Amino acid sequence: MKRNDLIRCTLCLLIAALLLAGCGRSAPAATPSAEDLKPETDVVRLAYTLELSANGHIFNAIAEQQGYLEDEGIRVEHVMVANDAAVFKAIQKGQIDVASNSGTNLPLQQIAEGMDLTIFGGYMLTGCMPLFSLVDTEWDGLEDLVGKTVACEPNLYAITGPLLDMGYDPLHDIHWLETENQIDRIKAVESGEADFGVVGTTLNYEVNTNPNIKILAYASDFLPNYSCCRVEAPTDWINEHPNTVRALLKAWIRAMAYYDLHHDETVEMVARLTYEEEAIIRAYIDNPHYDMNVDPMKRSVERAWNYMRDMGLFSKEAEQIDIDDHINVELYKQALDACQEQYGSENPKFYERMQAQFALYNN
């Protein structure tokens, strides 16, 4: 081969190699378009039980009233069922997409029994759940429950978990009186059938105005940030509707930011929507123990799972379950970041606080 031909051939090979190398480089990630983020469905079916009629879902009510759901291109359809047990049966039948007010213990029990649910957000971080007794009962602290009868279920880990940490066996060291409904727990204490009782947030008015009983403490006094109600859905549904989940969370985060600045207006709205007297609503919503929060609170959920497992509330098969496989914090973080970018100027301190909380409880 002639010298000039050899040079030309070498240059051609070099140029070709450079071109091929350029083709192998990753292009900068494109910003998702509005079409890419469009919700996969415009309707989310949210569980709503007869037991919730006193307060419903306050963040969702705000989101509807303020147009936040509409801004995200979705609407929430309330699916009425009788109670929490019916919520999970309806989820299994495909009649409900999302549950938000069924506690943390109940979805964890469902997961332990093999139901493929994923927790992706929160509603109440701590409800103001009162522990009460007759007015003349002496009280020195949580250990006073040992050897007594408590009108409640032992899966209330906000109380049984700290007792477990103290070295007690809560399932056997306390007699648990399970009743048909929570009003009956109050009656059980009044009649002397139970020494102590615990009821849910919305019964604070009934407990506070009952002259025969007194509030000794609240669940969050024993276990701060215990995770009262988590938001969960079938894992497959979340995987198939990530944009819808983000849209729902964005609407609820904005509602939480609104609530942060408009407490009294929210009370008036809840009273109007539920036809309840403001005094009944303020008995819990003004209580400092009452903390609504959309954050999934992964660390609190893990702690709850460990307490329930260690107390023997799960089957042996549940020991093979990694609860982290049933917690999705990424979609919430994406929704929070998007809200802060779009609406952060409306309440900067709120978004800074929520970002700090996420970093503390979800990493």
What are these regions (language model features)?
Residues 309-363:
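Conserved C-terminal helix/tail region of periplasmic/extracytoplasmic solute-binding proteins
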